[in-house]
Each structure stands twice: as structure tokens, then as C-alpha cells.
Amino acid sequence: MSAIFLTGTDTDIGKTVITTLLVHFFQKRNIPIFSFKPIQTGAIQRNGEWYAPDPVVYEKVTKPTSHNEFYGILLKKASSPHLAARLEGVQIPLQEIKEQIAFLETKYEHLILEGAGGLYVPITDEGYCMIDFMQELSYPVILVARAGLGTINHTVLSIEALKKRNISIAGIIFNQLNVDDHEIEEDNRIMVKKLTDVPVIGSVPYMDNLIERLKEEEVRDQLISNWDEKRLKGVLLNDAGSAIK
């Protein structure tokens, strides 16, 4: 069994889209993989039942035994996990979530875990953060960053935080969240690589109605067409040297 942890430089950076595309990327190469969201906030209600919004997107490429197999805990408020849990009067059962991940490791050959928010989003009121959870799991990390203006600072700071914890970094995927200045975006990729020495393993171009269009295989193929196949396969299949610290 092997796994990748996917995180982002911020919330609403496109982690769920990238997670879904990563599943498609590996499925196209006959590598089975299952996506899992350990902590989901911002539940949505349908026909009187609560659903996890990110796994609803996963279902465009994966059919689980049941919807709730995709996540560890579902909290209603769209906020950082510590606040959402406090408002519901519950504690996030970290040990149970880790046990659920351990079970999934026995059920599926490969996993991709999607974090909530960025590295330092609090999970508990005591200050236990997503980066602490990631460090305990010890999976190599893919960092999702926006492509446009301002991303250099956010991305470099996130990479430095991961390196300080000795967390293995598989690479960076840039996500174009809107139509931006191409010259800035290209320079961002060059400068981030220069400042961090972490490879850019892919980028996702801007597309209207992207989440809805993920159900189209042709669109998914188009979005992953420039991804670094050798590196991604190496990271997932535990090829030494494919991830850096």
C-alpha cells in the first residue's frame, strides 16, 4: 500500500479538483487508487440528509461502497475544523480517523488523502494543526497552489514549513483559478522552482464550470495532459528519490 497527502497553500485553492484529477490520472494508467477526506467541513443537505461536498466531486471518477466511506468526519459549518467541531459540541476523533485510514490501507492498493484548508488550519482548540496530522501520517505531500499573482510568497512559505517538519514533498501543482496574466504565471513557476528546489509536476488551466465538467472524460484528459507522469508514478509507487525533504 502507498499513499499521497494532498494539501494547499490556502482554502478554496482547488484541492478537491486536483484530488479528483489525480484519481483519474492514475486510473488511466491502470493504477487503482481511492480518495479520502479525513476531515470535511461545510456539509451540504440533500433530501434531508447531510453530504460531504468534496466527496460529491470525487464520485465523478470513483464509486465507493457508500458516500460516507469517502470521509472521516463531517461537520456542518464551512470553517476551520476546530471551530466547526466546537459549534457542534463535538471533538474531532483523530485516533478513530487514523484507524479508518489504516483500514483503507488494507482495502485499497493506493490512497490519496485530501487535507482541509492549508497547513496551519487548526484541527483542535489546543492548536493541533493539519501539518501535525500530516507529519504523523508520514505520506509524501503534493502542494496545490494558485497560478496567479501572489502565489510565490504563499507557496514558498508552505514549502519551507513542510521542509522544517521533514515532510517529504512530491511536488507542486499550480491551479489557474481565473484568467490571469500568462507572463506572471510563467514567471511564478520559474521563481517558485528556483526558491524552493521543488519540482512543478503539473498545472491545471482555467475552465468555466470546471467542477461540473469533470464528469467528462475528455475534459479530465485535457486537464492532466501536461502532468509529470514519471514523477507522479514514482512518488505513488515508492520510487526512492521521487519525493524530497
Predicted segments with their positions:
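Hydrophobic anchor at the beta1->P-loop junction of P-loop NTPases
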Residues: 6-7
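Charged helix-capping and loop-helix junction motifs
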Residues: 125-132, 156-159, 184-190
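Conserved glycine(s) of the Walker
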Residues: 13-14
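Histidine-anchored nucleotide/phosphate-binding helix
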Residues: 22-24, 130-133, 153-164
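Switch II (G3) loop of P-loop NTPases
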Residues: 97, 101-128
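Inter-motif core of Ras-like GTPase G domains
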Residues: 124-147
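C-terminal lobe/tail of nucleotide-utilizing enzymes
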Residues: 160-245
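N-terminal phosphate/diphosphate-binding loop that engages ATP/GTP or pyrophosphate donors
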Residues: 3, 17-91, 95, 100-103
